[in-house]
């Protein structure tokens, strides 16, 4: 079983540690539902490095356990906190395995297990002097549509995740005033862009390297659905570029893509 001393070694040995994160505190939340298989997330952790904090929400502990085992020689995904109402965890033996007293909430509550984990991460980040942590959410895909919509809506909340690794796609929050470069796209890979629930019409995007560039994007609702890298950019191995101004957006790409965020003037 992995442990926190492994985490320290992983952090020290990761040459890419935090180099591509805009914030100084990286937390991972595992939550129940369909999730990105650990073997399909290797590129993501290679870019972001060893996380600072791990939270498991309800049956997300089962996913956390899978990641802990799969990456035991590379990264430490040992949970720092286990929280939720535990109405979907298949076996309480998993809690005993990690020897952490769970933070248990009643089933009838005002927040989802994922929201509780996000709130806890923000409190933990504040202890480290970080106001806005970088949070990666693993899981939460499929199943109940209301939970899916809640996760989508949470990107517009004051306390939000930064990246959502769903079963087959990664959703990246592209904040106002930020650029993103999307590397390692296949010629048939789908690139989509959505607005957060904060607005249907605000903001504008600039793009480079898409088949249908930003001048073709819809002015309201979802700007671009099922777009692709242009043949020229693919042949030259150039990254697709997107820049957000005036609003936040969600960039949706395959798990195999590598997304790098940076803050520059659009």
Identify the meaning behind each predicted range.
Residues 132-182:
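Anionic-ligand-binding alpha/beta catalytic cores of soluble enzymes and soluble regulatory domains
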Residues 61-63, 88-91, 111, 144, ...:
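Short gly/pro/ser/thr-enriched loop/turn and capping motifs at secondary-structure boundaries
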Residues 2-96:
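N-terminal beta-strand-loop-alpha-helix module at the start
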Residues 174-266:
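Long, charged alpha-helical interface segments
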Residues 29-31, 58, 138-140, 165-166, ...:
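Short beta-strand segments
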Residues 49-53, 100, 156-164:
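Structural alpha-beta junctions
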């Amino acid at each position: 079983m992995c442990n926190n001393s492994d985490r320290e070694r992983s952090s020290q040995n990761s040459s890419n540690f935090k180099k591509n994160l805009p914030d100084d505190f990286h937390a991972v939340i595992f939550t129940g539902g369909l999730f990105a298989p650990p073997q399909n997330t290797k590129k993501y952790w290679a870019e972001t490095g060893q996380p600072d904090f791990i939270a498991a929400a309800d049956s997300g502990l089962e996913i956390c356990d899978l990641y802990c085992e799969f990456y035991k020689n590379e990264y430490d995904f040992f949970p720092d906190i286990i929280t939720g109402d535990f109405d979907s965890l298949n076996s309480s033996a998993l809690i005993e395995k990690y020897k952490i007293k769970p933070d248990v909430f009643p089933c009838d509550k005002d927040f989802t297990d994922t929201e509780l984990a996000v709130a806890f991460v923000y409190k933990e980040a504040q202890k480290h002097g970080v106001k806005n942590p970088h949070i990666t959410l693993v899981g939460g895909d499929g199943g109940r549509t209301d939970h899916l919509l809640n996760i989508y809506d949470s990107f517009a909340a004051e306390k939000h995740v930064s990246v959502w690794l769903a079963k087959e796609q990664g959703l990246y929050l592209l904040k106002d005033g930020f650029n993103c470069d999307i590397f390692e796209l296949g010629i048939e890979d789908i690139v989509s862009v959505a607005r957060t629930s904060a607005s249907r019409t605000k903001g504008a995007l600039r793009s480079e390297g898409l088949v249908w560039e930003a001048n073709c994007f819809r002015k309201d609702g979802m700007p671009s659905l099922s777009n692709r890298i242009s043949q020229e950019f693919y042949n030259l191995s150039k990254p697709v570029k997107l820049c957000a101004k005036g609003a936040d957006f969600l960039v949706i790409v395959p798990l195999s893509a590598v997304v790098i965020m940076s803050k520059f003037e659009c």
